[in-house]
Amino acid sequence: MKKLLVLFASLTMFACSKDLGGEVTPINVPSSTTLTGNITATTTLTSDKEWVLKGYVYVTDGAKLIIQPGTIIKSDISEKGALCIERGAQIVAEGTAAKPIIFTSGRPAGERTPGDWGGIVILGRAKTNRTSEPTIEGGIGRAFGGTNDLDNSGILKYVRIEYAGIAAMPNSEINALTLGGVGSGTTIENVQTIYANDDAFEFFGGTVNAKNLYAYGTADDDYDFDFGYRGKVSNSVSKRDPQFVDNGDAGNGVECDNDGTGSTAEPFTHPILDG
């Protein structure tokens, strides 16, 4: 049985500060709302409160998740969160340079570590080179790909993804941003990953174009292409942190495979890297 979206709204909390005149001034601390299960209708995450992902949260076929500029989404600490946009669903996360949308760990600042939560997974209906319908890795358990290379999964602009990347099992991880069969109608621009515990950006097939991506301090690959990805990634860079490496993986700036076995399945993986 599918779980419904459950919103646990906490009461607004207050802290106090004492000014030089001896007056006690209340300071509003934003309330938090927990997201869990399935999002089945158009839902807006507003910037006036803090949002928490508890476990795997799915935006289902026909639903749309809208996220306002400046919104902060954290993960539950004990039940690590991940956000999956299923085929036929959309995410509209359109931040600005002054008000980016931030996905991050639920731990206090200064205590956050890579792998504190899963990451963002977007699935579409564009072509892959799999002969049977593939299921995205990382324990998400949702199919991706199809025949519509123009498919539109929404907008991701001015978004920062921090401390993501968990392994559901060996060789089956969630990356900071995973794109499976995402079509060229989707907009991916100005997205930064920080301390991803697996790959920063991985493209499993599809035709989505992306620009102005920045991967910082990634454990494994900064950019990973496979399963017949045929889009363009432009004006994108990465920077490594020598103090943070995953000795179990041969992390690369770019990894590009047709598939895990190096087959000649078509369409061939053929990313265009431009600047």
Residue ranges and their predicted role:
Residues 4-13:
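Sec-dependent N-terminal signal peptides
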Residues 17-275:
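Beta-strand/loop edge motif enriched in small/polar residues
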